[in-house]
């Protein structure tokens, strides 16, 4: 997969406090994987490389609204999210209480996300981009290749990978710009994710490899 800023974009999933900050409710399950992968630092390196070399950046966020409590059924992790009010917002147009909450961006990422150039798409409602406008936004900008990272490795990142491939995009996953829960009953999600990345993605890169490819691209 050839990476070039004319047709390749960075897509980060859920760069939010809930899954990246010590204040996030799942921190006890995530902190080991985040530290082992150096996830936050690696995501920031990719942000910096993208901004310095004119790659478009897209954010696919995760939010839950009070009306979503009317859902009649949920999967295991969805149930945990609802029970613990993860990614909670007060309303679609209500920003009250957002700043500093689990749904807010990780503070160190805000300069990159809020620079007026990053495209924040509508929220994905479960795991994948089937329920938001990511694919539309990518196509409208002539993007056919994606550098993918963010959270969680085995859930939203993998779901975005699968759907983007189905939609005809080439996708490179940056394996150390993501992390996953170490769950006492369900297992280590990162191990499952790596196996599936190897089967599905057009490339599985380290952050070093991704940054090298981005910084050596010809404008």
For the regions a protein language model found, what residue spans apply to each?
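Short, well-ordered beta-to-alpha junction loops that form the rim of enzyme active sites
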Residues: 60-63, 151
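Active-site-adjacent betaalpha module
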Residues: 1-9, 18-19, 48, 52-53, ...
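N-terminal nucleotide-binding beta1-loop-alpha1 segment
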Residues: 13-15
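A short alpha/beta connector and helix-capping loop motif
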Residues: 6-8, 23-50, 54-61
């Amino acid at each position: 997969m050839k990476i070039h800023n004319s047709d390749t974009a960075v897509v980060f999933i859920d760069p939010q406090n809930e899954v990246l900050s010590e204040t996030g409710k799942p921190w006890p399950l995530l902190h080991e994987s985040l530290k082992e992968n150096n996830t936050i630092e690696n995501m920031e390196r990719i942000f910096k490389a993208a901004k310095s070399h004119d790659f478009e950046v897209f954010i696919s966020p995760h939010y839950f609204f009070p009306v979503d409590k009317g859902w009649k059924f949920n999967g295991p992790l969805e149930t945990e999210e609802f029970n613990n009010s993860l990614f909670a917002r007060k309303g679609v147009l209500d920003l009250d209480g957002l700043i500093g909450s689990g749904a807010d961006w990780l503070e160190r990422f805000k300069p990159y996300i809020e620079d007026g150039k990053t495209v924040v798409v509508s929220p994905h409602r479960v795991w994948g981009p089937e329920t938001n406008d990511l694919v539309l936004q990518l196509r409208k900008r002539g993007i056919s290749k994606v550098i993918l990272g963010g959270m969680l490795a085995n859930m939203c990142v993998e779901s975005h990978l699968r759907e983007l491939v189905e939609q005809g995009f080439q996708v490179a996953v940056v394996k150390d710009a993501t992390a996953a829960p170490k769950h006492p009953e369900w297992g280590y999600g990162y191990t499952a994710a790596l196996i599936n990345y190897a089967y599905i993605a057009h490339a599985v890169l380290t952050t070093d490899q991704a940054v090298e490819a981005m910084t050596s691209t010809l404008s």
